[in-house]
Amino acid sequence: MFAQILGETTCGIDGVQILVEVDVSNGLPSFDLVGLPAMAVRESKERVKAALRNSDYPFPMTRITVNLAPADLRKEGSGLDLPIAVGLMTCGRILDPEKLDNKVFIGELSLDGRIRKVSGVLSMIMDAKKCGAQEVYIPQANAAEGKLIHGIDVYTVATLKELVEHLKGKNTLTPLPKENILQNNNRIYHVDFADVKGQLVARRALEIAAAGGHSILMVGSPGCGKTMLARRLVTILPPMTEAEALEVTKIYSIVGLLPQADSVMLERPFRSPHHSISGSALLGGGSTPRPGEVTLAHNGVLFLDELPEFERATLEMLRQPLEDGEVSISRVRAAMTFPSKFILCAAQNPCPCGFLGDSVHRCSCKQSEIDSYKRKISGPLMDRIDMQINLSRVEFSELKTKEKGEASAAIRERVVKARLLQQERLEAVGIHCNAQMGRSEVVKYWNHNRLRFCNSTDKFVNSIQRISFYAD
């Protein structure tokens, strides 16, 4: 007997349809699994065998060959357990092969026949829809992701027996109801700009960075509020669109970081890796490339505190994602490109001791130490940071006041208005904010006659030279 069942796996952050071919023929009992399976897939043989027996379905004691096509793609994860089991039951005439057309099966099997949760289900459902499938069967624990994709029927199953009874028409399941992704987009943040005392210049700079999507570096002594301000940057960014929310949710589903309580990521990501992070953890890597912090921060904020403490080689890896909005990772087995459009928010002390220019403490560093500290950040990387501001210590009179600062919601309203103006202006060239403009867009849209502070050509040229405006 021969059967073909549709399954799904992941490659990078995208789903890939797999054709599971099962052949049961006469011969000594054996179970061969071919088609470049990873270790988790090879181990499915024992899980499938135990799940069938413990669900009261016979396991064929003959020669079994399972091929996972395309054979040149490495198959990762345990989500192919279910289609392999369905293929074996089809060969055993438990299921009718004609009723399995255009149906995709995703899930890991436990030894007692239950169907366990797998990572990356959202990407798999999206790929199944793109490939023309009509129905997808997923674990019950992945139901939240199944509600997000319209145009395809998604069923959840808890056990192998429940699936078989549905496919045989004995116990009909109903498809998951579809969910409007943005219906609950009223995010409640636990931090707010209203908590920040003083630092009016820094607050204004972060508002400009949020409005234009610009990267920013804050330099100041310890305790001046750099980290506090950075953690509130995400609260003034515009709400994510449906496409952005789905893209971020897909990434977090792949790496298994999707919050249990949420079906979709509505809050923009805020990632703050420690300065000891490796290059592969920051950009992504592994024998089969997986997303790193720059991809987990996609459509959000990547905060690098104590910037000079990071390894120089690690920081240099940020050049490509900051320039292109994506990161390419090449390995022997695969080459992947991951999205990485984020706002870089970095913070550092002005010197090794942290008190250069401080109004209270005296700096104890030698000039050579200060110069060496500043050289830890290369010129090419600094060129890619759009805004650099110096923060001073907040006066005690500002700290003791009970008056709250402007709330994040009020700042966010202005940011949203600014983004809408940019999107309207830049829609024709396919970009969304000022930070994404290239040389041609700057030449096309930048009208220097509107710069009122430049009342003469000489003053304008001197200003441009002073801020090191580059041709690229």
For the regions a protein language model found, what residue spans apply to each?
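Walker A/P-loop
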Residues: 217-259, 324
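P-loop NTPase nucleotide-binding/switch module
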Residues: 170-208, 212, 239-294
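The Walker A (P-loop) glycine that initiates the GxxxxGKT/S ATP-binding motif of P-loop NTPases
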Residues: 220, 284, 306
